[in-house]
């Protein structure tokens, strides 16, 4: 097929571009180093701190007064705060509360120690005393100004290990085998999990490779960066009632946490352009403690970067192209200090909101305007010179002629007079109609070919009936009418071909039993035009479930059937949809029952379980890609099916894997119907290739996702749609970049379903900087996490799971250590974990990646098929969907359901995300867990019976595993169903199944919800607190 570069077998080497001035460091006026090229006439502006990164000199002038001897150290907890987790509990009194549920088995109480007397001092403590603390609601910790250290007080042994969680629930036992959906959307066996909320001191298993240590809590604030004074924080403390005057609170004056302590006097004039977690020591303990409630959490979801929206308004939207940092390093040495991924995530066909559609451009007889040297498409960043007769390429600086039909005069500023009528010169994203020279054959029609397993498991589970009904219901909505073509092959131990010629009234079935030498009968009548043979196709789909309802064949000749489908499709290409119910057992591609062998895990051969066993599958994928055949795999078996091998077909053809373990039409039917219908009816780009170009001195060195790499930088995508994203890493080819900006252009050449050959073009620009701090400030957590997840999954295919998880942790440690070194000279960092505002969620997302299904635990935590299916899915997800899967939504809905319903439901009140921790759950509440692939309704044990009865009907008191969630005839149930519908419609690419679970129903509660509370410790993996402590310890190591 054609490529973008007609007449040019490979792109030429990118020539030298005009020199540009290097970007100055933030806060220093840029020095002129020559005129820049491109439409941007100014160089990179110094970074202006946003509201989230305020900077302001300290208000105090001069050194602070020397504190009197005998006062407390800054790290000591205030005697007023005696109920902070990990500190000494108060002696028993009338105000003591029972420990929370999910506590230690047997209900062992906390070990209690006497409180020390308040040290003698003439100065009052800073800040008013907190109110009494209720169980589960901790008061913010407090600290004092820096004072002379006092002799440590012997505190005795630390408190006994405890766990905490929800009222009234016990630690759930390990499960055996339950076929519930795993994340994402896969059903998973219940692992042995011992819940323990990390906010409470306890003996916790550490991250693999690190010793288990006692983690205690201390009053340590989440240190915010300084900034201009804002509204004073609302305090929950009562007025101070002591008999002495209260000192002014410096932290309140600067809108900081009350625990804030000023740096030494010699740096009073400096600002802290970073965030930090302040880690202090508990007296009598060698471990630091943390206030887990102040940890950063992405409760607002993914926030797309817009730091350069004003400077570069013509950049394409970040939904199409997201760089890991919007500041490109100017040298290899600077790039080597950036330990985070340097690259981008591209989603070329991302869905656009109404009113923001990509403009369609037809250059007509003029031909597409491209650079003669680097083949860049004309875009908003090219410049016109010589009175409009020449234009300069923004990527290679080549001076090109302007065709006569495209000529326009320039105004006094050098701007074309017809600029407003040229979307390609004002929009960062455009779609261009390609002329015939971009085709090596006529555009292919949309082709849908179905390869369906009809063995006994397919018929008994109801899969065959659901698939046939769904295909028939979508025939009128298949893209490309009236050019669309369709065909079918079914198989068990033999192959069944179907002649659907339009002249027939009923389809003719032809059976081929020779699996070694495949013979395709009537090849011209197996793939037919849908509009011409619609009657025959309808008759076939109506009769398909009945044809095999009494089939007891258990064999699967999948390999021969795949070869037969390839032989039918290789003339035109198209989309091949495979429905597989069992392990391939006959003919080519026959697979063994590998399963999960516990003896292999932890050895050098462990990764072999997660890659294709037979090279047949990768070779077939390569052949299909060559002939423009994209493959989507639907797998259904509750037994081992070897998704690692089957998924290879989707991986290298730009497709995706759908996994329904233990499929039963009564349970999973709706999910299959919606996802298959979405696959069939969404707009698809056929026979596509994608290339991303960038300026001189840099190149994209590696690509990650579902595709076949045709050359060093050309991605072959037989079928691509809006639900596919691709990640890539960037490297510097030159020691020093001389340009002031770097340009990126993504070009997707494809055939639209209507038969037009089109080119989707996205162009963006980023400044080149000399300051590592600026790279951190302009970092995009979403893009970094997307690359990290793909790299970790790929590493798990060549190394142990422990190695893949440790690699994530080490990358984050190196990045935080390098960032700490930037500020270690100017600021006394002490025991603070320092990080930029832009990366405040990176540690939590890193933890979530290590707990995701592809990397989770070992063989007892998830099945091999579930692990591999999740990996194939995550490799193709766009940024927003991946972040939601890693840190799902948790909402409380019972209070909202009790409110009177308005004419139009306002979901803002209910869609307030909660931290993913057991502490967020109240036994009196009703919660919804949503990761984009499933919905879990968690009914607290003490939830009002009226609410449960309204939502569940007469079965409200029964075992919820046997209750079907459906709408009841009352307003509360209808209101909840509207909310569920809204959550499903927010992302139509997958259809989340809805599961009901009641508090204490084990092991379902542990599997469906508790094990997915990322911030809690589970099954040997770290909780959020322990993870932060591990990062901090390693960052401080030399």
Swiss-Prot record:
- Provide the phenotype resulting from gene inactivation: Lethal in homozygotes. Non-Mendelian segregation of the mutant allele sec24a-1 due to defective male gametophytes (pollen grains) leading to a male-specific transmission defect. In the missense recessive mutant sec24A (G92 mutation), altered endoplasmic reticulum (ER) structure with an abnormal distribution of critical component at ER export sites, thus leading to the partial accumulation of Golgi membrane proteins and a soluble secretory marker in globular structures composed of a mass of convoluted ER tubules that maintain a connection with the bulk ER.
Annotated region (Zinc finger-like) at 371-396
Tell me the membrane topology, using the record's own terms: Peripheral membrane protein
InterPro entries in the cross-refs = ADF-H/Gelsolin-like_dom_sf, Gelsolin-like_dom, Gelsolin-like_dom_sf, Sec23/24_helical_dom, Sec23/24_helical_dom_sf, Sec23/24_trunk_dom, Sec23_24_beta_S, SEC23_SEC24_subfamily
- State what this protein does: Essential protein. Component of the coat protein complex II (COPII), that covers ER-derived vesicles involved in transport from the endoplasmic reticulum to the Golgi apparatus. COPII is composed of at least five proteins: the SEC23/24 complex, the SEC13/31 complex, and the protein SAR1. Acts in the cytoplasm to promote the transport of secretory, plasma membrane, and vacuolar proteins from the endoplasmic reticulum to the Golgi complex. Involved in maintaining the dynamic identity of organelles of the early secretory pathway. (Microbial infection) Contributes to viral systemic infection of turnip mosaic virus (TuMV) by triggering the formation of host endoplasmic reticulum (ER)-derived viral vesicles that carry the viral RNA (vRNA) to plasmodesmata for cell-to-cell viral movement.
Gene Ontology biological process terms in this record: endoplasmic reticulum organization; endoplasmic reticulum to Golgi vesicle-mediated transport; ER body organization; Golgi organization; intracellular protein transport; male gamete generation; negative regulation of DNA endoreduplication; pollen development
Q: What is the lineage of its organism?
A: Eukaryota, Viridiplantae, Streptophyta, Embryophyta, Tracheophyta
From the Swiss-Prot or TrEMBL record, give the protein name.
Protein transport protein SEC24 A
Q: Which SUPFAM superfamilies match?
A: beta-sandwich domain of Sec23/24, C-terminal, gelsolin-like domain of Sec23/24, Helical domain of Sec23/24, vWA-like, Zn-finger domain of Sec23/24
Gene Ontology MF terms in the entry: zinc ion binding
Q: Cellular location of this protein?
A: Cytoplasmic vesicle, COPII-coated vesicle membrane; Endoplasmic reticulum membrane; Golgi apparatus membrane; Cytoplasm, Cytosol
GO CC term (a single one): COPII vesicle coat
Q: Does the keyword Metal-binding apply?
A: yes
What does the entry list as the binding residues for Zn(2+)?
Answer: 371, 374, 393, 396
**Membership in a protein family:** Belongs to the SEC23/SEC24 family. SEC24 subfamily.
Gene3D superfamilies under this entry?
A: beta-sandwich domain of Sec23/24 (2.60.40.1670), Sec23/Sec24 helical domain (1.20.120.730), Severin (3.40.20.10), von Willebrand factor, type A domain (3.40.50.410), Zn-finger domain of Sec23/24 (2.30.30.380)
Chain positions covered by the region annotation Disordered: 1-247
The record's subunit annotation is: Component of the coat protein complex II (COPII), composed of at least five proteins: the Sec23/24 complex, the Sec13/31 complex and Sar1. Interacts with SEC221, SEC23E/SEC23A, SEC23B, SEC23G/SEC23C and SEC23F/SEC23D.
Tissue specificity annotation: Mainly expressed in pollen, leaves, inflorescences, roots and stems, and, to a lower extent, in cotyledons, petioles and hypocotyls.
Comp. bias regions, Pro residues = 22-33
Q: Which UniProt keywords apply?
A: Cytoplasm, Cytoplasmic vesicle, Endoplasmic reticulum, ER-Golgi transport, Golgi apparatus, Host-virus interaction, Membrane, Metal-binding, Protein transport, Transport, Zinc
């Amino acid at each position: 097929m054609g490529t973008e570069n007609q007449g040019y077998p490979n792109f030429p080497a990118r020539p030298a571009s005009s020199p540009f001035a290097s970007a100055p460091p933030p806060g220093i006026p840029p020095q002129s180093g020559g005129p820049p090229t491109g439409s941007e006439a100014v160089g990179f502006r110094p970074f202006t701190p946003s509201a989230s990164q305020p900077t302001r000199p300290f208000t105090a002038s001069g050194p602070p007064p020397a504190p009197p001897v005998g006062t407390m150290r800054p790290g000591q907890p205030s005697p007023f705060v005696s109920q902070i987790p990990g500190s000494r509990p108060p002696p028993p009194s009338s105000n003591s509360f029972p420990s929370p549920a999910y506590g230690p088995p047997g209900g062992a109480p906390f070990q209690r120690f006497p409180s020390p007397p308040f040290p003698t001092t003439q100065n009052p403590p800073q800040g008013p005393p907190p109110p009494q603390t209720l169980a589960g609601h901790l008061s913010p910790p407090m600290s004092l100004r820096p004072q002379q250290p006092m002799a440590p007080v012997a505190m005795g042994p630390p408190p006994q290990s405890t766990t905490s969680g929800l009222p009234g629930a016990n630690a759930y036992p390990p499960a055996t085998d339950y076929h519930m959906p795993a994340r994402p959307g896969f059903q998973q066996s219940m692992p042995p999990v011992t819940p323990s909320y990390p906010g409470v001191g306890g003996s916790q298993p550490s991250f693999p490779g690190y010793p288990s240590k006692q983690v205690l809590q201390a009053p340590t604030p989440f240190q915010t960066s300084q900034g201009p004074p804002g509204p004073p924080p609302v305090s929950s403390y009562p007025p101070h009632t002591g008999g002495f005057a209260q000192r002014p609170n410096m932290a309140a004056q600067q809108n900081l946490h009350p625990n804030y302590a000023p740096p030494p006097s010699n740096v009073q004039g400096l600002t802290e352009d970073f965030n930090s977690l302040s880690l202090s020591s508990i007296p009598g303990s060698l471990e630091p403690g943390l206030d887990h409630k102040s940890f950063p959490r992405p409760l607002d979801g993914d926030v797309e970067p817009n730091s350069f929206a004003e400077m570069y308004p013509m950049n394409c939207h970040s939904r199409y192209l997201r760089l890991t940092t919007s500041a490109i390093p100017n040298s290899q040495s600077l790039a080597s200090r950036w330990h985070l991924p340097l690259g981008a995530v591209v989603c070329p066909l991302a869905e656009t909101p109404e009113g923001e559609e990509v403009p369609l451009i037809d250059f007509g007889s003029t031909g597409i305007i491209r650079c003669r040297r680097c083949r860049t498409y004309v875009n908003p960043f090219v410049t016109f010179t010589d009175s409009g007769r020449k234009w300069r390429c923004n990527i290679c600086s080549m001076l090109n002629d302007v065709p006569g039909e495209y000529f326009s005069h320039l105004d006094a500023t050098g701007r074309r007079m017809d600029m407003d009528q040229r979307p390609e010169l004002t929009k960062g994203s455009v779609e261009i109609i390609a002329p015939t020279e971009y085709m090596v054959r006529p555009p292919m029609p949309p082709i849908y070919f179905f390869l369906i397993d009809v063995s006994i498991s397919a018929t008994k589970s109801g899969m065959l009936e659901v698939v046939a009904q769904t295909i028939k219901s979508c025939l009128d909505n298949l893209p490309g009418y009236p050019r669309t073509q369709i065909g079918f092959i079914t198989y068990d131990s033999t192959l069944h071909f179907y002649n659907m010629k339009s002249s027939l009234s009923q389809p003719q079935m032809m059976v081929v039993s020779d699996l070694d030498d495949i013979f395709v009968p009537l090849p011209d009548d197996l793939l037919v035009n849908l509009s011409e043979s619609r009657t025959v196709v309808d008759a076939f789909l109506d009769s398909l479930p009945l044809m095999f309802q009494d089939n007891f064949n258990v064999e699967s000749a999948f390999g021969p059937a795949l070869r037969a489908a390839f032989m039918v499709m290789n003339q035109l290409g198209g989309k091949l949809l495979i429905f597989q119910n069992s392990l391939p057992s006959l003919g080519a591609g026959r697979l063994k029952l590998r399963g999960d062998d516990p003896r292999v895990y932890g050895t050098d051969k462990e990764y072999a379980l997660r890659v294709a066993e037979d090279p047949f599958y990768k070779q077939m994928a390569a052949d299909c890609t060559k002939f423009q055949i994209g493959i989507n795999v639907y797998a259904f078996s509750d037994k081992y099916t070897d998704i690692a091998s089957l998924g290879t077909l989707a991986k290298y053809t730009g497709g995706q894997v759908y996994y329904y373990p233990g499929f039963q039409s009564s349970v999973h039917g709706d999910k299959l119907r919606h996802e298959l219908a979405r696959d069939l009816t969404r707009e698809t780009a056929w026979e596509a290739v994608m290339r991303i170009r960038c300026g001189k001195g840099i190149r994209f060195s590696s690509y990650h996702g579902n595709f076949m790499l045709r050359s060093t930088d050309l991605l072959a995508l037989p079928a691509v749609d809006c639900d596919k994203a691709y990640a890539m890493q960037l490297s510097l080819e030159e020691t020093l970049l001389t340009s002031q900006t770097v340009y990126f252009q993504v070009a997707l050449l494809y055939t639209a379903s209507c038969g037009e050959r089109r080119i989707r073009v996205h162009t963006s620009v980023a400044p080149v900087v000399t300051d590592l701090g600026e790279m951190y400030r302009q970092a995009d957590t979403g893009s970094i996490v997307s690359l990290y997840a793909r790299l970790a999954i790929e590493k798990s295919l060549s190394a142990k799971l422990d190695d893949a998880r440790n690699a994530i942790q080490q990358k984050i440690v190196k990045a935080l250590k390098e960032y700490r070194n930037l500020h270690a000279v100017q600021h006394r960092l002490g025991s603070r974990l320092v990080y930029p505002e832009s990366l405040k969620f990176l540690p939590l997302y890193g933890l979530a990646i290590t707990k995701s299904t592809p990397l989770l635990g070992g063989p007892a935590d998830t099945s091999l098929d579930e692990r591999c299916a999740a990996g194939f899915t995550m490799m193709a997800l766009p940024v927003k969907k991946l972040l939601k899967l890693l840190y799902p939504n948790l909402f409380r809905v019972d209070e909202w359901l009790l409110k009177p319903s308005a004419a139009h439901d306002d979901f803002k009140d209910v869609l307030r995300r909660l931290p993913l921790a057991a502490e967020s759950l109240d036994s009196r509440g009703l919660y919804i867990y949503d990761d984009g692939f499933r919905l879990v309704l968690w009914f607290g044990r003490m939830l009002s019976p009226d609410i449960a009865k309204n939502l569940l009907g007469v079965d409200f008191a029964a075992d919820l595993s046997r209750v079907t969630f459906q709408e009841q005839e009352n307003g509360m149930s209808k209101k909840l169903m509207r909310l569920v519908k809204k959550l499903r419609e927010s992302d139509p690419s997958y259809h989340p199944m809805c599961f009901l679970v009641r508090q204490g129903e084990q092991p379902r509660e542990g599997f469906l919800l508790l094990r997915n509370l990322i911030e809690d410790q589970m099954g040997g993996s770290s909780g959020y607190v322990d993870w932060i402590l591990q990062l901090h310890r390693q960052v401080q190591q030399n």
